[in-house]
């Protein structure tokens, strides 16, 4: 299975970045051990800004005018599993990941609009969407704010895939307030990746 791992670190603390990197590396190692083809996209240097030219081309016949976005879109379309590893920023997606979604999952890639104006799914090859998220807030605060990042990835993104596409969410809340939680979290990541 072709697995695309999208790694979107925010400007998080060193300890949080270490946990995210460990989760990403664990996912890669576990998937490769199970003989999956794994590609990692690190969004650290990805420009999240949807420029005026891209916005103007958004609903055209060729909305991908940037070479990097075009390459990333091809990787998404060729993957059977999409694993997104990120740290939540104010209970939603970090700017790099939100910009990546806006610039890469354009009409013709993740969805299309037919002549009657009906939206058609575009990511029909996806069997799995997995989110691995590190939260700065508590579980209760995240639930009260309705967890925008999770909703975008598991609901909105899934609407672009087949109705049988499976989803999974692995979350770690306020790791600095819990002792020894990192190893348990990495164990959960390993077990989930082994089931893909």
Question: Which residue stretches match the model-derived regions?
Answer:
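Hydrophobic beta-strand segments of well-ordered beta-sheets in folded domains
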Residues: 1-4, 126-131, 167
């Amino acid at each position: 299975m072709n697995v695309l791992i999208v790694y979107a670190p925010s400007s998080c603390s060193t300890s949080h970045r270490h946990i995210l990197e460990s989760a990403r590396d664990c996912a890669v190692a576990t998937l490769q051990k199970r003989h999956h083809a794994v590609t990692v996209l690190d969004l650290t240097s990805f420009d999240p800004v949807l420029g005026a030219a891209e916005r103007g081309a958004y609903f055209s016949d060729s909305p991908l005018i940037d070479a990097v976005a075009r390459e990333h879109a091809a990787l998404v379309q060729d993957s059977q599993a999409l694993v997104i590893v990120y740290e939540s920023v104010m209970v939603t997606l970090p700017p790099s990941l939100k910009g990546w979604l806006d610039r890469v999952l354009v009409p013709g890639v993740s969805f299309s609009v037919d002549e009657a104006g009906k939206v058609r799914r575009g990511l029909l090859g996806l069997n799995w969407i997995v989110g691995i998220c590190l939260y700065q807030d508590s579980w209760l605060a995240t639930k009260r704010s309705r967890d925008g990042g999770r909703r975008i990835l598991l609901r909105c993104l899934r609407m672009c895939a087949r109705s049988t596409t499976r989803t999974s969410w692995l979350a770690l809340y306020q790791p600095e307030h819990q002792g020894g939680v990192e190893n348990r979290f990495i164990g959960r990541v390993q077990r989930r990746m082994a089931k893909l």
